Amino acid sequence: MVDLRVQIGRLMLENPIMPGSGTFGEQLTSVLDVNLLGALVTKTITADIREGNPPPRIAEFKDSVLWSIGIPSKGPVHYVDTLVPFYRQFKPPLVASISADTVEQFGELAARISVPGVNAIEANISCPNLKKDGNAFAMDPEATEQVIRAMKSATPLPVWAKLTPNVGDITVLARAAEAGGADALVVANAMLAMAIDIHTRRPRLGRVMGGLTGPATKPVILRMVYQCAHAVQVPIIGCGGVSSAGDAIEYMLAGASAVQVGTASFLSANTMLKVIDGLRDYCETHQVARIRDLTKAMVGPHEVRLEDALTV
């Protein structure tokens, strides 16, 4: 019998597969046995009610999807009063994703949603820091550390920092999040991108730029997971372009302890369950007794320096 359990800080998950924030909603529970997942991750919650970005919000390509949703949110009251009671009926640990405009607001929101039934908080720090220069918190090491530290002071729950790939050296941000007290890192959010309709000459998205997700992003995010795994001691959750067990295994070999599935679930609601079954089959075929033994188990050169890699 293969042991699929993985440890993410203080949380023990029955398996390493969970949804990416924003890709999982209550409607999926009617078509998917969510009790088979390792964890549940909510859509991102903000301190205020938000409608989201103007349309068009989505542009699809054969190997990726470009999004500009804008984090629509019904606010913390709706989350605490409605969503948490709903998710309590399921077995997997519940991870609440939050986003805020200031360091202080991150701490305040973390405290507000730290209610029974919530097992961890994921900090979406790819939003702009309105009190500083308007750049994303996750692009600034100092701001990243401040946000995580504020959240750790405000809640007894584990805090996961979701990093952005839109930086030069992601290990700098990974170390900053770890210094702030992050219990785990989610690597990574969507990649900033854009597209233009050549017939209308207009941008494909209402806000011009958006976040690129899907298989096309996996090699880039995989590299970032590998780098972060050699830069920090906290667990890493890989996120980007996972649609098969093979993708998840690659992330684990690169250094991830768990994996989030996002875009692929829109194409097939059962993707996460297929990935879990595939992980079990792989372990049985390759005589891997514990799936956690795959983490950071890539064979070959380790700790490749960025400057050496750039000479290809």
Task: Give the positions of each predicted feature.
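N-terminal capping/small domains of soluble enzymes
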Residues: 1-94, 100, 275
